[in-house]
């Protein structure tokens, strides 16, 4: 059997009076109960005769339902039982089906419990609809008053002709002096019909966890990895804004025009640059250097660049054709060399623009400066706006903020994982870094969708603003 992983807290109050309380829950998980306890500070409740024992105590019993459920013509009776088995903790009336406004939901549940605990059962449907509880309170087992007086487990006519058989077992007895809590280890399968009841003076509180097999959790994580990774924003808590008016924000940050319009008079001066551009390839120098974050985070920019490349090929093909051009003819040239000076080899310019990559380790975080920003450095207490892409060591992206409103947080105040507070400190506006954050400075042994436990995380970050 695969190990079980806790996913949520389970709690259940079982009041005294031998009232059957179902353990069933709408939560799709196995229930693992680890503690039973009573509150010794509460006043004890008297029994039916008004007696209170010298040593108040409560006995917890578990009642297991066996047998099979089938359809029944008595819809109202079936509604009562479904309300009981489906978890009667809700204070709202069940939706659908007939109901008697003179009865509260509690009265309905008590009627269903009496049917479960009834000692006799009639054979025909009419007799079952007209039958009333005989008032005898069993302790989990009883005798059915059949013609042959055959002994059987305590039964409930929840589904017409078939019976719901109940078997009870004592779990523990608690008192208010010494034994007011008891560690237990009870696992209830998903969909299993189990009840609890208490005989005594105090309510018993059961606590534990909802658990699922670890294999199921891993399968769920794999499915989530295959989905759109941009839906998650776990390390930082910010959300991507995909509005159209913000989609070109990164282009505005570059401050460099993508297209320049020139006339045929200027073509002779620009011709050497066009030849140099064709030799260098399709990428702009700004995208060539060190593969910064801008080259990775904007799919829209990449698509636009391809269109520009196609236009460039068309223009170059037209130039090669023997055609006379007038001064009024205009051509579109991409501003791939706008940053180059009027003189000097273009190759030297490109080499000078390549930033030097500086790698250092600060408090366990590996910091690789891909691009140095301008202005003052960010310090603790500053509110910073960031773009980022988060990846695992295998290259799988689990989170990102590529466009829209930048992710904003206060540096050094614990609003993000520790590795971010360390790695972002010292950046200037426009700066880009690659942060390699070990597990103990990220999420440790916790597992998140897309992030296995004990994972080293890699973030490519860019600082957009300091407030």
Swiss-Prot record:
EC numbers: 5.2.1.8
Gene this protein is translated from: fkr-4
Name this polypeptide is given: FK506-binding protein 4
Residue ranges constituting the PPIase FKBP-type domain according to the UniProt record: 381-467
Start-end of Basic and acidic residues biased regions: 271-287, 312-332
Annotated Acidic residues bias: 71-80, 147-163, 213-254
Location(s) in or outside the cell: Nucleus
Keyword match Nucleus: yes
Reactions mediated catalytically: [protein]-peptidylproline (omega=180) = [protein]-peptidylproline (omega=0)
Keyword tags: Chaperone, Isomerase, Nucleus, Rotamase
One of the record's GO cellular component terms: chromatin
Organism expressing this protein natively: Neurospora crassa (strain ATCC 24698 / 74-OR23-1A / CBS 708.71 / DSM 1257 / FGSC 987)
Main location: nucleus
Region (Disordered): 64-163, 208-357
SUBUNIT field: Binds to histones H3 and H4.
Pfam families membership: FKBP_C, NPL
Described function: PPIase that acts as a histone chaperone. Histone proline isomerase that increases the rate of cis-trans isomerization at prolines on the histone H3 N-terminal tail. Proline isomerization influences H3 methylation thereby regulating gene expression.
Activity regulation details: Inhibited by both FK506 and rapamycin.
């Amino acid at each position: 059997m695969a190990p079980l992983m806790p996913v949520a807290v389970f709690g259940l109050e079982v009041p005294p009076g031998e009232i059957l309380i179902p353990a069933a829950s709408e939560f799709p998980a196995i229930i693992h109960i680890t503690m039973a306890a009573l509150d010794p500070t509460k006043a004890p409740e008297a029994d039916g005769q008004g007696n209170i024992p010298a040593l108040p105590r409560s006995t917890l019993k578990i009642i297991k339902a066996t047998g099979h459920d089938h359809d029944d013509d008595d819809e109202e009776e079936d509604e009562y039982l479904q309300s009981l088995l489906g978890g009667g903790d809700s204070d709202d009336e069940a939706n659908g089906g007939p109901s008697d406004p003179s009865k509260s939901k509690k009265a309905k549940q008590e009627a269903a419990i009496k049917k479960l605990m009834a000692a006799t059962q009639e054979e025909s449907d009419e007799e079952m609809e007209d039958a009333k509880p005989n008032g005898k309170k069993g302790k989990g087992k009883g005798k059915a008053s059949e013609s042959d007086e055959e002994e059987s487990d305590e039964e409930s006519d929840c589904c017409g002709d078939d019976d719901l058989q109940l078997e009870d077992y004592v779990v523990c007895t608690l008192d208010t002096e010494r034994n007011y809590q008891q560690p237990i280890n009870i696992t209830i399968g998903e969909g299993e019909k189990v009840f609890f009841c208490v005989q005594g003076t105090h309510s018993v509180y059961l606590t534990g966890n909802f658990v699922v097999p670890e294999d199921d959790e891993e399968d769920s994580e794999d499915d989530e990895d295959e989905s759109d990774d941009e839906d998650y924003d776990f390390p930082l808590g910010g959300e991507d804004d995909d509005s159209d008016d913000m989609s070109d924000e990164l282009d505005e940050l570059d401050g460099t025009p993508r297209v320049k319009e020139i006339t045929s008079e200027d073509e002779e001066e620009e011709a050497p640059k066009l030849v140099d551009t064709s030799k260098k390839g399709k990428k702009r120098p700004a995208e060539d250097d060190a593969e910064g974050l801008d080259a990775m985070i904007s799919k829209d920019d990449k698509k636009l660049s391809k269109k520009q490349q196609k236009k460039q090929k068309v223009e170059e093909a037209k130039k090669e054709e023997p055609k006379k051009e007038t001064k009024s003819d205009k051509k579109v040239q991409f501003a791939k060399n706008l940053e180059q000076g009027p003189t000097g080899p273009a190759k030297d310019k490109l080499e000078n623009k390549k930033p030097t990559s500086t790698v250092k380790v600060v408090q366990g975080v590996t910091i690789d400066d891909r691009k140095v920003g301008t202005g003052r450095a960010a310090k603790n207490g500053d509110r910073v706006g960031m773009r980022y892409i988060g990846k695992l060591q295998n290259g799988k992206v689990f989170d990102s903020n590529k466009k829209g409103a930048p992710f904003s947080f206060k540096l050094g105040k614990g609003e993000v994982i520790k590795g971010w507070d360390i790695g972002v400190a010292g950046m200037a506006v426009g700066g880009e870094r690659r942060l390699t954050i070990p597990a103990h400075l990220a999420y440790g042994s916790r597992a998140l969708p897309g992030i296995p436990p004990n994972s080293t995380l890699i973030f490519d970050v860019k600082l957009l603003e300091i407030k």
